[in-house]
A protein has these predicted regions:
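Short runs within selected transmembrane alpha-helices of multi-pass transporters and secretion channels
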Residues: 146-164, 175-183, 201-214, 296-300, ...
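Membrane-helix interface/capping residues of multi-pass secondary transporters
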Residues: 42, 53-56, 93, 122, ...
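Helix-loop interface residues and adjacent transmembrane-helix termini in multi-pass membrane transporters
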Residues: 36-39, 47, 53, 87-90, ...
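Hydrophobic transmembrane alpha-helices of multi-pass small-molecule transporters
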Residues: 68, 183-188, 213-217, 289-293, ...
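Hydrophobic/aromatic residues in alpha-helical transmembrane segments
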Residues: 25, 41, 80, 121-122, ...
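Transmembrane helix-bundle signature of multi-pass secondary active exporters and lipid flippases
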Residues: 28-82, 146-153, 242-309, 329-337, ...
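Small-residue-rich hydrophobic transmembrane alpha-helices
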Residues: 56-116, 153-172, 280-344, 375-389, ...
Length: 465
């Protein structure tokens, strides 16, 4: 007879160092695998004979639309995962199950609406995001397949996040690794053997996510789980949905801002450097994404620990997990800095053999990343506000770097430095965002120092207290 799953009470009692290792390592592996998952498509597409450079530029044009899809997924999924972590800390299993059911229903609705809208206006959207007559075909071929599988993608990432937040990070990691490995196998088969090109890469992606989603649904229908989908789980409780969407608003706006900013970036790159510049920036984004995902893996490990202990009123543990996560994130961004500034040619050569594209990507990588050393800490700080349900602060930090600082610089810097000014806008905005974060996180830590474990968190202003 299977043993009934219990809430992960170790989150409130075990050593923070041990917990962070247990929860962050699977998250790091899963998020690194996720970044490799995206990189695999770019690597194979960049080496398509005769059209690799234009194809990878076309793929880069789809990034804003992919970011917007991700934004809608995080609007639902992150809020639900955060609520479930806190509810498990409070041992409120009934409401946690309702949150899970709401997450599935909302993801289906949002994913379907997004798919229908984008398919109706796909060509104008892609032109708006920076496509040219040369790259539109590749961007359209890729996005059509991705959009047909959009509901699958939303559900896959949403349920994977909840599996991790409910105390099973190894399973979440395993599903991600399985998806990456399967995608690495299917990509060359569909792209080269079947001659499907970029459409083959997209189809492989959707198939892999569908297989992992099927197992995730099975996992949440098992009777031995404290967190499970009830029969007839396609239902919506607006109070729960409102709270979940409120908490997820921060990462939603961050990803939406990323979509808008990427559109501005592509338009400026096309203006000052043409399709080649968009392809170069696409390669740089894939390289940066690898290191960002490692930091996000630490964030994923921190989130259930911070959320549970906040729900249990153990504020000293919340502060400790934040400080430890910040330290490790800074170490990771140190490696990111070294790779960008001293070994750019090694990183870029993975994606393309085109000499002109390689030269522009290598120069751009050096210009974009001199301030990344402090970016990891800034990401962890933003994640802490999100994990504690501090919606307004999370939203502001999510938007400050991209909209408040980066967008104006994208239009100002090229006036003086041409295409290099577009790349130089990134480190300047990173530095300004980190100063803003320092002020806000310092204020939060001072408030934590005034709270004793067990006190009501009124002074913190959390939406889920």
């Amino acid at each position: 007879m299977p043993q009934t799953q219990t809430a992960p009470t170790e989150l409130g009692s075990e050593s923070i160092g041990i917990l962070l290792k247990k929860y962050a390592v699977p998250g790091i592996i899963a998020m690194t695998a996720s970044s490799l998952y995206n990189m695999v498509d770019s690597i194979y597409i960049g080496h398509i004979p005769g059209s690799g450079s234009l194809a990878i530029s076309g793929l880069a044009v789809t990034f804003p639309l992919m970011n917007l899809s991700t934004a809608l997924g995080t609007l639902v999924g992150v809020g639900a995962a955060t609520m479930i972590s806190v509810l498990l800390g409070q041992r409120n299993y009934k409401i946690a199950n309702k949150v899970l059911a709401n997450e599935v229903t909302l993801n289906c609705i949002v994913g379907l609406l997004f798919t229908v809208f984008c398919l109706m206006f796909l060509d104008p959207i892609l032109y708006f995001f920076g496509a040219s007559a040369n790259t539109l075909k590749y961007a359209r071929d890729y996005m059509e397949i991705i959009l047909y599988g959009n509901v699958i993608t939303h559900l896959y990432f949403g349920l994977n996040s909840i599996i991790r937040s409910s105390g099973n990070p190894k399973m979440a990691m395993g599903l991600t690794l399985f998806t990456v490995i399967l995608n690495s196998i299917l990509d060359p088969i569909f792209i080269f053997t079947f001659g499907m090109g970029v459409r083959g890469a997209a189809l492989a992606t959707v198939i892999c996510q569908a297989v992992s989603l099927a197992y995730s649904i099975y996992y949440f229908t098992r009777k031995d789980n404290v967190l499970r989908l009830p029969k007839g789980f396609f239902s919506l409780e607006w109070r729960i949905a409102k709270d979940s969407l409120s908490i997820g608003m921060g990462p939603f706006l961050m990803n939406s801002a990323s979509c808008i900013v990427t559109m501005f970036i592509n338009q400026q790159l096309l203006k000052y450097g043409g399709d080649l510049a968009i392809g170069a920036c696409g390669i740089i984004n894939r390289i940066n994404f690898l290191f960002i995902m490692v930091v996000m893996g630490f964030n994923q490990g921190m989130q259930p620990i911070a959320g549970y202990n906040f729900g249990a009123r153990k504020y000293s543990r919340v502060r400790e997990v934040f400080l430890r996560t910040s330290m490790w994130a800074t170490i990771i961004t140190g490696f990111w800095f070294i790779a960008s500034e001293f070994f750019p040619e090694v990183m870029v050569s993975i994606f393309t053999n085109d000499p002109s594209l390689k030269e522009m990507a290598e120069k751009g990588l050096r210009v974009m990343n001199p301030v990344v050393l402090v970016v990891g800490w800034q990401m962890v700080s933003t994640n802490l506000f999100q994990s504690l349900g501090m919606v307004r602060k999370s939203i502001f930090l999510s938007l400050s770097r991209q909209l408040l600082y980066l967008v104006p610089l994208l239009y100002l810097m090229p006036l003086f430095f041409d295409i290099h000014g577009v790349f130089a806008a990134f480190p300047i905005s990173d530095a300004l965002a980190c100063v803003t974060t320092l002020v806000m996180i310092g204020n939060l830590m001072r408030k934590f120092s005034r709270l004793k474990d067990g006190d009501e968190p009124t002074i913190l202003g959390s939406a889920i207290s």
